[in-house]
Amino acid sequence: MGKSLVIVESPAKAKTINKYLGKDFIVKSSVGHVRDLPTAGQTATPTGKAAAASTKKASTTDKEQQKREKERAALIKKMGVDPYHGWQANYQILPGKEKVVAELQKLAKDADSVYLATDLDREGEAIAWHLREIIGGDEKRYKRVVFNEITKNAIQQAFKQPGELNMDGVNAQQARRFMDRVVGFMVSPLLWKKVARGLSAGRVQSVAVKLLVEREREIKAFVPEEFWDINADTLTADKQDFRLLVAQKDGLAFKPVNETEALAAVAALNKAQYEVCKREDKPTTSKPSAPFITSTLQQAASTRLGYGVKKTMMLAQRLYEAGYITYMRTDSTNLSAEAVENLRGYITKHYGEAYLPSQPNVYGSKQNAQEAHEAIRPSDVTVTADDLEGMEADAHKLYALIWNQFVACQMTPAQYDSTTVSVKAAEYTLKAKGRILKFDGWTRVQRPLGKNEDQILPPVKVGDSLKLVSLDPKQHFTKPPARYTEAALVKELEKRGIGRPSTYASIISTIQDRGYVKVDQRRFFAEKMGEIVTDRLDENFDDLMNYDFTARMEEKLDQIAEGEVNWTAVLDEFFADFSRDLETAEQDESLGGMKPNHIVMTNILCPTCSRPMGIRTASTGVFLGCSGYGLPPKERCKTTINLGDEEGVINVLEEDVETAALRAKKRCPICETAMDAYLIDDKRKLHVCGNNPNCEGFIVEEGEFKVKGYEGPTVECDKCGSDMVLKNGRFGKYMGCTNDACKNTRKILKNGEVAPPKEEPVHFPELPCENSDAYFVLRDGASGLFFAASNFPKSRETRAPLVEELKRFAERLPEKYQYLTSAPAHDPDGLPAVVRFSRKEKEHYVRTETEGKPSGWMAVYQEGKWLVTDKRKNAK
């Protein structure tokens, strides 16, 4: 009898499982996904000449139709899924996974059975299905095993009762993937065309950004209002301090709205007699919270440990794969009977009978909990954070948090004696509240969060007199709505039914990566371009951007997973409505199409041509652009002025600071929204309405404004020898020459280093472009050497240079690229060698290609010579 192959996603999980299976099993990892939709278009677009030949005899209408069909075919090829023909998918092995797949195929060929032991959620089910599809062979050999925890007992039980692939779960994952793919690939080009290049849209991510944009606007529209509170410090008959808050006047809530009202109350209270009129003592209890699900773990880790969502899930994944906790992507608060029984025994032994409720505490889960297995808990309650092996310190802290929550959830309530004392002083009523802990219950294990009410009040009784010591009036201002933290945003998404446990972390990560929002001191701030894109999508894709619609779509995905509805029918219904909205959005604005990026004109004159300048918003920020930019080329003015943010950083973690910042901002003269301030120069400050470009309000303030002096690094300019200093423009930080006549710039690389000097483009008039009348110039970019049209950006045609072309014009090449002229120009079959660039190795190499794909023949330059590797199938 041969061995069985077990496939999991990660090497760490494979290592843990391998400990619990015998010598008859080989445990291997797929290292995550092995197959997915294509990462980029795989076929070249026909050249201009070929396209022209194919439509030469066609009518104008036919040409338009052929053009649309060609564009649609190219889009489908790029997306890898065809929504027009039954959602056929073109799955491909992920780059770099070829060796992993080959090894799994080889091992599976010799195995009696193949156990697919990927995670138990839809993503894990999909990975298992892809593995079965690419390995192939008799489907009867494949067995599906799922487990909620990686313990010896759980693994052995799972392998005793293997099941089959859950294709409903696979189809639910595919449906989500396909919808997200269609929205991203079909809406993003529309945003490039209508708003600005480099923008993107996502089915769920755009809705999450909308939440942040709406909160940003609530904050900007908020007008802080003044109010006062008054505390009275008194003494009891036995000289005990007793502080009370003025709560009522004539039986109604009292909250002075200005200093005059507050001081009038102080004057009256100074003359009054203070007498206790009511005392209420009652027992209260505090029950423990449910064990963690994905969202509550993320929130607690943020609040208690300061961890971001991504970090929390990464650490939880490691704890799970090491066998320390149960599966971390769940929205169920259920606990297994065995886990509860073990925990109750642990509580009795270590804390005593008083901490154990007569019956286990039961917590409700939301309806249709997707991963309805168990809450997140320790695999073994007897293992504490101090017992973990091979885990980093942050993982120890997260485990302790999970352990504490799990143990606390099955303990008795905390018991308090709560007291409220009311004191009469003239027409005013003052109050004080206190609470005394009588029995700690669950709080012995998990410290409660929130306002600390545990204070002992003096033993006063009704009729007792108090002596006034002093009155303490304090001014306050109402606060705007709180900014979302990562954890608060997850909580809001969960409340609205948007996303699922397996998607929260990716949603949070994606919205930050796209540049529509930024995180400062763990709070989200919506960027201006995020507001514009949200508005445009909201106007043209009302279903897509509707919170309830997105939540209903999540419910439909749940129904697909349960086998209640046909997955392609759900996709067809979604695509029919979506494509209708897309078709309208692509029209001209006058026909209901998406509005272009609006420019707000100002009275600031262009320093170059004296035309008015307008406030423009690009994906890189807000700037001033000359109104002459839209004129014909000969008259066009491309002058722009970067707008630097006003000096000063708001610490939003400090109480009332954001309120103070709002009060300091100017209000828009049109809509009264708080305005954003930018320094134009040391003489002018531009205040722009927070609703720009929807509102055209702006104010130019003139005066003397201090522009912070330069204190950063300098490098020598490669053009004129002057100093280059660090500058901040709308495209981010860069080095700029201090010589105004030079205007040379250099990029700052991601690692913080200054990019090497740019090589001047090398002109090749002998090499005409195929799609325009221009010729090619050789440019040096982040992806190495490439040919680009000489009339860029009018023509954006590019291609890789051939070695034989560089040899032919070797005298024009810069010295540092002369080595490329010694490369082999052809492979043994006579195919021309193309110059390519490896981002990983940061060096050029040459290879031959067949229909845009590597042939297997390549050469790299090492130690002064070219080394050839030939992996072609027919290579001799």
Curated annotation (Swiss-Prot):
Q: Which cofactor does it need?
A: Mg(2+)
Q: Which residue stretches belong to region Interaction with DNA?
A: 200-205
- Stretches for region Disordered: 37-69
Q: Where is the Toprim domain?
A: 3-150
Q: Where is the active site?
A: 327 (o-(5'-phospho-dna)-tyrosine intermediate)
Q: Which GO terms describe its biological process?
A: DNA topological change
Pull one GO CC term from this UniProt entry. Answer: chromosome
Q: Which segments show compositional bias classed as Basic and acidic residues?
A: 59-69
What EC number(s) does the entry state?
A: 5.6.2.1
Residue span(s) of domain Topo IA-type catalytic: 166-582
Which controlled-vocabulary keywords does the entry list?
DNA-binding, Isomerase, Magnesium, Metal-binding, Repeat, Topoisomerase, Zinc, Zinc-finger
MF GO annotations: DNA binding; DNA topoisomerase type I (single strand cut, ATP-independent) activity; zinc ion binding
Q: Where is this site: Interaction with DNA?
A: 33, 176-177, 180, 192, 329, 514
Name of the molecule in the record: DNA topoisomerase 1
What is the species listed in this Swiss-Prot or TrEMBL entry?
Vibrio cholerae serotype O1 (strain ATCC 39315 / El Tor Inaba N16961)
Lineage runs: Bacteria, Pseudomonadati, Pseudomonadota, Gammaproteobacteria, Vibrionales
Name of the gene encoding the protein in the UniProt record = topA
